[in-house]
A protein has these predicted regions:
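Dynamic "connector" segments at or just before major functional cores
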Residues: 1-161, 166-186, 191-207, 382, ...
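Short secondary-structure boundary/capping segments
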Residues: 150-154, 229-235, 252-258
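Basic, amphipathic alpha-helical segments enriched in Lys/Arg and hydrophobic/aromatic residues
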Residues: 354-430
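Flexible loop/turn segments at secondary-structure boundaries
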Residues: 89, 143-145, 174, 184-187, ...
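Domain-level cores of phosphate- or acyl-group-handling catalytic modules
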Residues: 187-246
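Short, conserved catalytic/metal-binding motifs centered on acidic residues
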Residues: 32, 64-65, 76-79, 94, ...
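An anionic, glycine-rich sequence signature occurring as long contiguous blocks
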Residues: 1-11, 15, 236-349, 432-444
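Short amphipathic alpha-helical "interface-anchor" segments enriched in bulky aromatics
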Residues: 32, 79, 328-381
Length: 444
């Protein structure tokens, strides 16, 4: 017999609980920053801004903001969610102090914060998170400003705000670098692309810079200067290429037998899609030596709207690359993987990027960098602490199932325990995550 469901109004609600902790899973992020040395590195980077020894450590304040963003907050006041829980999270700086720390970070200190991030990343990779290959995805996105902010401007979509350019590591999803730009910044600015690439490379451990690195970009990366800079830096490139009239004419000259079947991620044939190489049909002498032009032809999905440039029911896309190899289907598949950067950007906007709270442009750049730290914390947690579906979960799911877990903090003698609800479906996963993290030697 099924028991009748209890009526909520019969449950007595009081505010006299003792030792209860909400967002208990956030302690995993805090301990992660300590164990991989990020907290100590940030403290060292911002040591000069500490007003007195009794004041809050600026590095820890910045760490707390990053943890708050990783937990789903989007403004400084959201850090209040951890007040009254000092036994687990430690003392939190006031809103005024937090704003003061963020606004004290100028361009020089921002460079030191980036170095601190790189130090922690090297330790995370040494702890087992080093990717098997290195593929950098560069892309821009639009952020709306809902009030007057310094250098906010109209954009090509008739909105108003900023147009940051960022770089994410495809294999792990880590947010390596981003620069804030006015809303009217160009999409194919070579200098901005190379600046972001340089910042991203600086985030990689020194020994990994000796490996083959591929940078991917959409058509915004199709500039002679950027591809030449990639060649000078010893970086392979794969960038979108404009379908000019010359390119379209070359495509129409390709015979049916010169198209090869495109493949999907599993290596199987991709229905309705073919690939061909146009290198010998287009003058690429102005591009770096060894550049190749590859084209994909695909039937648009049912219901898709055709453009006036689609020919014979097919849609064409091209990319320019200096990768070697005769398997052009595999090269096209690798370039197509660039689309995953959209997932990274979406997750980034859900982790502090969407809302830039300050008026000053410099302060919003600091906030953007703090968002990158938050994105990395979630990535590192999945890489070294989680398994199964949680290891690939998006931020919203991680927060709902792990970070927002309720618990009770109890003390027995000299031992302090964080007791999770045994009926919560993901309690065991959170316990296992702490165990995996603590198996890594502490570095601070």
């Amino acid at each position: 017999m099924v028991k009748p469901e209890a009526r909520l109004e019969t449950v007595e609600v009081t505010a006299d609980g003792v030792g209860l902790v909400s967002h208990a899973g956030v302690a995993l992020l805090v301990e992660l920053t300590d164990r991989v040395g990020l907290t100590a590195a940030l403290s060292g980077a911002l040591a000069g801004t500490r007003e007195r020894r009794s004041a809050h450590d600026p590095g820890r304040v910045l760490r707390d903001v990053a943890v708050m963003l990783a937990d789903g907050g989007d403004c400084v006041t959201d850090i209040d969610a951890y007040r009254g829980q000092e036994r687990l999270f430690g003392a939190r700086a006031s809103e005024t102090t937090t704003h003061r720390v963020l606004k004290a970070i100028d361009e020089r200190l921002l460079a030191r914060v980036r170095s601190a991030r790189a130090e922690a990343r090297a330790r995370v990779w040494d702890a087992g998170a080093r990717p098997g290959s290195i593929t950098l995805n560069i892309d821009a996105t639009l952020l709306t400003a809902h009030s007057e902010k310094e250098l906010a401007a109209g954009n090509y979509k008739h909105g108003y705000g900023f147009h940051p350019l960022g770089c994410w590591l495809d294999e792990t999803g880590e947010a390596l670098a981003a620069i804030l730009r006015p809303g009217n910044a160009g999409s194919n600015t070579a200098a901005d692309h190379f600046t972001v690439l340089g910042l991203a490379l600086a985030q990689l451990p020194a020994e990994d810079l000796m490996r083959e690195i591929l940078v991917r970009a959409d058509i915004g990366g199709q500039t002679h200067a950027f591809t030449a800079d990639c060649r000078d830096a010893g970086i392979r490139f794969s960038v979108g290429y404009e379908l000019s009239e010359t390119v379209r004419a070359a495509i129409l000259q390709v015979t049916e037998t010169q198209w090869v079947q495109a493949i999907n991620a599993g290596g199987l044939n991709r229905d309705g899609a073919w690939v061909t190489e146009l290198t010998d049909r287009i003058d690429l002498s102005a591009w770096p030596e060894g550049s190749r032009l590859i084209c994909r032809s695909e039937r648009p999905h049912p219901g898709a709207q055709f453009t006036i440039f689609d020919d014979h029911g097919y849609r064409y896309t091209c990319f320019l690359t200096d990768q070697e190899g005769n398997d052009i289907a595999k090269l096209e598949l690798r370039h197509r993987g660039r689309a995953r950067v959209e997932d990274s950007i979406r997750s980034g906007k859900d982790t502090g990027m969407r809302n830039l709270p300050h008026h000053a442009f410099e302060h919003n750049q600091t906030w953007l960098e703090t968002s990158l730290i938050a994105q990395d914390l979630l990535c590192w947690t999945k890489l070294i602490c989680l398994t199964g579906e949680l290891a690939t979960a998006e931020p919203k799911r991680l927060r709902q199932r792990l970070l927002h877990t309720a618990a009770k903090l109890v003390r027995h003698g000299r031992r302090t325990q964080l007791k999770l609800d045994r009926d919560w479906p993901w309690s065991e996963a959170l316990v296992a995550a702490f165990q995996r993290l603590r198996a890594i030697p502490a570095l601070c």
